[in-house]
Each structure stands twice: as structure tokens, then as C-alpha cells.
């Protein structure tokens, strides 16, 4: 799933995403086309939707047809999502008469859950939806249409006396029951246009029709409820890429876990997993580094038995696959490299910055939002935007330290020692080099603490190697100081996390055994 509403993604992003999907055999492109921040698809029946709800950033129907044809040629289905009845601010800017509360609407620049919602009690709402579904159903040939259904808080429904009266007259005790009513009527319209409906967890209630497909962002427990109720389902909760989790942690989450409570027949209702890339904190320049290569690992998870769990071998192959994806034109490597050159001002300076950046990963979406209060207008061209989730050094450093932890040949041990020395020395040198550049390139000051810490961590590494090689026990004071450094370096700082700390901790621990 690619969200193109929060930040619009130009067509080249769409095409190269499809190229990457084809390369790793992902076969459904879920296109999140509407949300509070933008209505991104042309409607000829209702042109005000894009005229006032898109900032002029949307796909024409001819462009959509081209994307569908491009995807189809690569064995990929395209399933559009039109998120209703909530997350509809961009719809209501041009068509406020569809709203539950009549007021002026503006495109949301910030992110969250807003009160605006379609009025589910008026026949005019369903007349509009009938026409809209007919138009979009004809444009998208796939059997499925996704209508969201998530995070409608019910506030505007409760604020409208006529809606409250409708609920009372229909013996509805909560807005959840009103949403079920809406979902049932919506599903009837979808069926009339010979389509099937997909929605998020929120559309699932005891009254939800069995042929609605549930996509779960809440987790395996929620998905299990759907399956036990007889609904087909798709798991997405563990595969939200904006959580910035490692490929390892996501790879180990199977859509049907070992401890599932589902019967064999109920397990057949789980259609699989779906990777989700939400766009609150990405742009066209950074999206690929958030999606790839981690998504390749998830593609393998979805196509493999749950017993496939060899993480080191997965990383070995993922490194190779990452280079192959780069050769296909994906920008998960070249995009951050370009960004670092913009920050540092020259290729030579960027090479020094890259040393520091290679040790860092961005904090999760929620952590960044809490610290920065990101919005649609927040610049996404800062140091954190050019860090990569689960960067290669995380696994590479683990492999380099392994000969110190396990029996290794003298040759392997010597090679690891030499490479670790080179790495640690590069960390020590990068800090002063970046300090010298910072006055002329102020964005480097976004990583002031990390610049200092990487020097200290490099010295920790060199001193640990020296102690281990000489079989000399370091002082208790030294060990305490290094453990304190590792602990403070593990804190979220400057919107980043170090990915190098566990192997360094292992080296410090080893010094006490010699």
C-alpha cells in the first residue's frame, strides 16, 4: 500500500514502485488515493473533488489507465482506496454538502483524526456514492475496491441533531452501529457495480456482511476475530514501514503465527499480508529508502512457510537484492546519497557525513511526530530524512564482531580485526571533519550530539580491540564509563537511533573476560 494523499507521489515513483514489486513478486498494489490531506484522482462526474481538494496534485484518468496497464504487464493488480466515511476532509472542501456538519472545509495540513465525516443517514449520500463507485469501478478493472472505514470518531455525527434522531429511531446505541449501517449500505452499492469491498478493522462488527474483506492494522488478534466471524482478512499491522522497524523484526511476523487460535478452515480465510507505506513523513525523494529493501524481505515472508526464519541468511540475500533493485532504477541508495550531498555541500564532505549516517536509523513515525509535530508543510529534507531504516551497517557490524564471539580461523579473525579498526578509525575522524563543516552548512547541526557520540564510540571500539588483543583487563572505571556511554547513546536523539550499539556492547563485555 502506498499513500499518495498525505504527500503526493509523482508518476515516476508509482512506476518504479511497481518495478520493485514485480522484482520481488508482490502482486497487489493498494493505492491509497484519498485522505484528509488530498483527493488524488480525477473524477469526471464530480470535478470539484480535485479542483478544490488536491492542490492541483492528482492523477488524471488517462494516467491511471496507464498505471493499471503497466502494473498488469508485470502481473500486478491495482486496488484503489477511497477512505470513507471519515478521513474525508479533502472530499468536503469541494462538496461540503456531503458532510455531517455543514461548515466551510479546508484541506488538512496536519495529521490526525478529524471530525469531518460523510452523512450516513441521507439518501443523497448514497446517490453520490452510487455514481462515484460506478465511475471508479469502470476505471479500475480489479474485482476489489477499498473503502477504508478507519478512524471515524463519530463527533460530527453526534453533533448533528438529525443524525442523532436517526440513530434513536433505528435503535442505534452507538456511532459504531451507525458505521455498520453505513458499511452495509455501501457494500450493497459495491455489489450492484459487480465489485467486492475491502475495509480496515473498524468496519468489522457482528453485523458486518461476510463477504467484506477486513484489512487489519490492529494486529493478529483483530484479524482472528474477523476470520472467526467468517470474513476474509489481510494482515498489515506488523508491516507498517513508517514504524522504521528492522527487516528482521517484520520478517519474523507471519500473517498466521504459530500460536494462532484459528482452525484450519478459518486460517484459509487469511488471504495474506500487505506492506503499508504511509506518507506523513516521506516525499518523492525519500520514499524509496523507506520502502526498499525491507519490503523485499517481507515479500519473501508472504510467499514462504512460517517456518522460514533464518535471519542471517535473509540478510545475506537481502544485501544482494538491494543492489539488484538499485540496478532497476529504485532510489533507496541513490536518493539518500543525493540528499547528503545537498546537506554537506560537496561530495567530499558528503562522504564524511555518510560515515555518521550509516550508523543511524530514523526514529519511528510516532516518535518523530511527538518531537517535531510534523505536518504536510514540514520540510522533509533534513539529516533524519537521509538515514535509512535498518541500514546495512547494523548487520555488517554484527558479522564483523562474530569472530570475537565464536571460534574463528586465524585468517577470519585477522580480517575482522583489520576491518573493525578501519571502521572505528573512520568514526573517530568523521566527528572533527563534520564539526569543521558545520558553520557553513547549518543543517549538520541537526546531528551535533550524534557527531560527538560517534567519536566516543569509535574510541570505545579501538580501546576494546586493544584490550582483547593484549589480553589486558581494563579498569572498572573504564568499563563503567563505556557502559554509561552505550546507555546514553541508546536514547532517541536528534530524531535518530544508533544501530551499532549491541555489537559494541559485546566487545566491551569481552574485555572483562580477558
Annotated model-derived regions:
Residues 122-144, 165-514:
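Substrate-binding groove of N-acetylhexosamine-processing glycoside hydrolases
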Amino acid at each position: 500500500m502506498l499513500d499518495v494523499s498525505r504527500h503526493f507521489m509523482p508518476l515516476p515513483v508509482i512506476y518504479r514502485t511497481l518495478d520493485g514489486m514485480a522484482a520481488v513478486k508482490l502482486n497487489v498494489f493498494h493505492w491509497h488515493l484519498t485522505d484528509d490531506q488530498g483527493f488524488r484522482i480525477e473524477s469526471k462526474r464530480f470535478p470539484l473533488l480535485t479542483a478544490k481538494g488536491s492542490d492541483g496534485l492528482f492523477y488524471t484518468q488517462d494516467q491511471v489507465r496507464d498505471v493499471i496497464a503497466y502494473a498488469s504487464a508485470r502481473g500486478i493488480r491495482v486496488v484503489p482506496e477511497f477512505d470513507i466515511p471519515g478521513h474525508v476532509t479533502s472530499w468536503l472542501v469541494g462538496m461540503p454538502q456531503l458532510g455531517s456538519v455543514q461548515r466551510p472545509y479546508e484541506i488538512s495540513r496536519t495529521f490526525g483524526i478529524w471530525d469531518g465525516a460523510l452523512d450516513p443517514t441521507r439518501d443523497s449520500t448514497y446517490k453520490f456514492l452510487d455514481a462515484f463507485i460506478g465511475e471508479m469501478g469502470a476505471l479500475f478493472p480489479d474485482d476489489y475496491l477499498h473503502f477504508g472505514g478507519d478512524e471515524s470518531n463519530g463527533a460530527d455525527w453526534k453533533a448533528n441533531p438529525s443524525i442523532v434522531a436517526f440513530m434513536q429511531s433505528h435503535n442505534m446505541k452507538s456511532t459504531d452501529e451507525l458505521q455498520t449501517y453505513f458499511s452495509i449500505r455501501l457494500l450493497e452499492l459495491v455489489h450492484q457495480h459487480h465489485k467486492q469491498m475491502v475495509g480496515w478493522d473498524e468496519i468489522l462488527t457482528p453485523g458486518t456482511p461476510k463477504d467484506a474483506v477486513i484489512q487489519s492494522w490492529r494486529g493478529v488478534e483483530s484479524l482472528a476475530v474477523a476470520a472467526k466471524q467468517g470474513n476474509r482478512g489481510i494482515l498489515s499491522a506488523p508491516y507498517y514501514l513508517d514504524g522504521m522497524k528492522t527487516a528482521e523484526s517484520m520478517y519474523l511476523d507471519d500473517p498466521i503465527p504459530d500460536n494462532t487460535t484459528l482452525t484450519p478452515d478459518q486460517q484459509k480465510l487469511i488471504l495474506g499480508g500487505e506492506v503499508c507505506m504511509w506518507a506523513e513523513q516521506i516525499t518523492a525523494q525519500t520514499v524509496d529508502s523507506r520502502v526498499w529493501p525491507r519490503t523485499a524481505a517481507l515479500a519473501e515472508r508472504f510467499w514462504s512457510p512460517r517456518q522460514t526464519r533464518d535471519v542471517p541468511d535473509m540478510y545475506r540475500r537481502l544485501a544482494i537484492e538491494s543492489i539488484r533493485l538499485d540496478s532497476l532504477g529504485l532510489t533507496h541508495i541513490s536518493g539518500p546519497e543525493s540528499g547528503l550531498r545537498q546537506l554537506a555541500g560537496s561530495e567530499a564532505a558528503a562522504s564524511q557525513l555518510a560515515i555518521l549516517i550509516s550508523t543511524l536509523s530514523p526514529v519511528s513515525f510516532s516518535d518523530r511526530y511527538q518531537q517535531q509535530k510534523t505536518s504536510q508543510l514540514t520540510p522533509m529534507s533534513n539529516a533524519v530524512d537521509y538515514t535509512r531504516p535498518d541500514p546495512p551497517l547494523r548487520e555488517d557490524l554484527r558479522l564483523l564482531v562474530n569472530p570475537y564471539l565464536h571460534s574463528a580461523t586465524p585468517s577470519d579473525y585477522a580480517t575482522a580485526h583489520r576491518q573493525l579498526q578501519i571502521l572505528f578509525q573512520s568514526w573517530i575522524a568523521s566527528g572533527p571533519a563534520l564539526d569543521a563543516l558545520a558553520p557553513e552548512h547549518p543543517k549538520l547541526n541537526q546531528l551535533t550530539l550524534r557527531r560527538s557520540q560517534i567519536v566516543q564510540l569509535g574510541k570505545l571500539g579501538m580501546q576494546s580491540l586493544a584490550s582483547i588483543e593484549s589480553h589486558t583487563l581494563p579498569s572498572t572505571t573504564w568499563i563503567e564509563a563505556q557502559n554509561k556511554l552505550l546507555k546514553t547513546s541508546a536514547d532517541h536523539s536528534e530524531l535518530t537511533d544508533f544501530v551499532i550499539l549491541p555489537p559494541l556492547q559485546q566487545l566491551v563485555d569481552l574485555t572483562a573476560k580477558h
